[in-house]
Amino acid sequence: MEVLANYIGGTWTKSKEENTVAVINPASQEVIGAVPLGSHTATDVASAVAAAAGAFAAWREVPVMKRVQPLYKLKQLLETHAEEIARTITLECGKTLAESRGEIQRAIENVEVACGMPVLMQSEFSENIAPGIDEFMIRQPLGVCACIAPFNFPGMIPFWFLPYAIACGNTFIIKPSEKVPLTMLKVFELIDQLDLPEGVINLVHGGKETVDALLEHPDVKAISFVGSTQIARYIYAKGAANGKRVQAQGGAKNPVVVLPDADLDMSVKIITDSVFGCAGQRCLAASNIITVGDQGVIKEALYESAKSRTTGFGLDESVEMGPVITPDSRSRIEHLIDKGIQEGGRLLLDGRKPAISGFEQGNFIRPTILEGLPLDGEVIRTEIFGPVMSLIELGTVDEALTFINSGRYGNMACLFTSSGANARKFRSQAMAGNIGINIGVAAPMAQFPFSGWNESFFGDLHGQGRHAVEFFTQTKVVVERWPKEWSRKF
């Protein structure tokens, strides 16, 4: 199996690391690639940083109108090759083709927003702020920036950062997850066609050694990360200790509240899509479904909807849910289901160890539903990152808000209702960075920041939109005095 190459300084280069790890199709366990993994990947990082640092001085001087021109072409190339990239995502990540296509569309939307950088970078000016004095603020790029990407959205999440960073005048390095490196390889085949100076955008493969090399290199000025809370905390602490600007998106345990006045059919469809879409492997997946009052009807409807969901290989257009990423992930999810039963929960729908014809070795779990779990138990409070729904019954909206705000995470909270008063109360009081009203996946569009609170985010500025512009630039305030007359000249 050929080892995937890095892309450094505008050239495809072989890694200095001889040890490799296989890239596995999670539906079949077929080996579909290999990436370098080991201490010598730090040498690859050094080469990528040198290339990016070498390109920065000239790239930052390119007018912003010129810097965004390659992004227009990148958008067109992504649109042209969207189906090919989507199929690659499905092969290595496991999600359905429909989900993979949607992922690429979100990537394209971020490129479109970044194309507006000539306006987004406009700053502030105050004329005659004091007699004869003008004051203004300018934005300048940071230098070499890097993205450490997760496995679950290999085609989208790097685009929360990449187009904004280079449009602001920075140079960039992407380190994809070693589990799903093929998607970025496809993207970089398109980047290679852009009219960009060598070293502006670079790709390096690897694992923890690669990450640590990026966190420790003095010429890397900013780090963007998305992944688990445990790793996000590590990235933030180590990056900040080395003087870097860091944004680190962590995990989640997302609650959805359903009031008695909610539209039944709409709520059921949207909630089941949120819980089981992408096999539950997304940081905005609903997990704890809270019904206010006795709502046996919606519980039955959720059960029937989940039970009918088709599970299988994502390239089959009829499939509605694919596998989870690794056997270890499946084992962890199954352990948490077992734990829920041990905690006194009732298993309404058991998705463990399904038989998927033709894909018996795949990492499959069918939709699973638990109810009656203790509110302070491990399963209710732990991010499962799999297709598991926990049903909770509470008496009032206030009780639901108290429960939501007692959690350690704060990525998303959603409410289903036809009451404007309850919607306004919920969006004001729920302690989460992304709020959905009659929405099951409150994913911000590219113009808005992907906001996480509490242990779902470490940092100050998020990805996407204006937050990305602020993250990838530093401000400089200039105060100028221009007297009408000079009393003396040297």
PLM feature spans:
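Hydrophobic face of amphipathic alpha-helices that form TPR/SEL1-like repeat modules
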Residues: M1-A34, R352
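Residue-level signal for inorganic ion chemistry
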Residues: G10, Q29, R67, I89, ...
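Residues at or immediately preceding the N-termini of alpha-helices
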Residues: P26, A42-V45, V64, A82, ...
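Conserved C-terminal structural/oligomerization subdomain of aldehyde/semialdehyde dehydrogenase
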Residues: S28-V35, L196, V220, V257, ...
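Glycine-rich loop-to-alpha-helix module at the N-terminal edge of alpha/beta enzyme cores
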Residues: I32-M121
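Short, well-ordered beta-strand elements within core beta-sheets of diverse protein domains
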Residues: G33-G38, G54-E61, C147, V256-L259, ...
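Rossmann-like NAD(P) dinucleotide-binding subdomain of oxidoreductase/dehydrogenase enzymes
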Residues: S123-K269, Y303, L394, G459
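ALDH superfamily catalytic-core signature
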Residues: Q230-P374, D398, I437, W482-K489
